[in-house]
Amino acid sequence: MNNTYDVIVIGAGAAGLMCSIEAGKRGKSVCLVDHSSKIAEKIRISGGGRCNFTNLYSNPSNFISNNKHFCKSAFAKYTQNDFIDLIKKHNIDFYEKKLGQLFCITSAKEIIDMLIAECIAQNVEISKETKISSLTKNHNTYSIKTNKGVYSCSSLVIATGGLSIPKIGATDFGYRIAKQFNLKVTNLLPALV
């Protein structure tokens, strides 16, 4: 089995799934790695199990950031309307609850299934139950030792999320990696998004 990829994404939540899909669309070989046997657990429980997947009125002014232009560039590349188009492409019925909040009529599982289908369409390899024991960088290559062997890539994305819900798999892995690579981490504060 070849474990060398252009991109490895660690964390199979909403951000990790979308990042994997978009990298695949750009012609990159992608492996999405997660420690859990189930992916996208936070999506599954969001919105009371119906997944509040976007807001019609989202725009850069709704976000607080040290870089006031970050959200502008992000929204210029992918908007809530792009995601709504993806939902429609997969024939997922949804409704507006209040103030632009969009929810699935049936279940959040539809969103998870859609994201997995999009990963498959982009030839993203999904590796569940993959426990990482070490992560190193040598020149332009990352090496990731796991219980399933050694993976390597030239681009690594850490999309492990925060510490909000440990019982569904949240860990401090991303923070430990940030510390290992001397990346600045801001003070952690509870927030409602």
Segments predicted by a language model, with ranges:
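Glycine-rich, phosphate-binding/catalytic loops in enzymes
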Residues: R26, G48, F173-R176
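Predominantly flavin-linked oxidoreductase catalytic cores and closely associated redox partners
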Residues: E118-V193
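Conserved N-terminal/central alpha/beta ligand/cofactor-binding core
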Residues: H35-E125, T130
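Residue-level detector of alpha-helix initiation sites
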Residues: V9, G13-A14, K38, G162-S164
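N-terminal Rossmann-like FAD-binding beta1-loop-alpha1 element of flavoenzymes
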Residues: Y5-L32
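Redox-cofactor binding/interface segments in oxidoreductases and associated redox assembly factors
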Residues: I10, I45, I158-A159
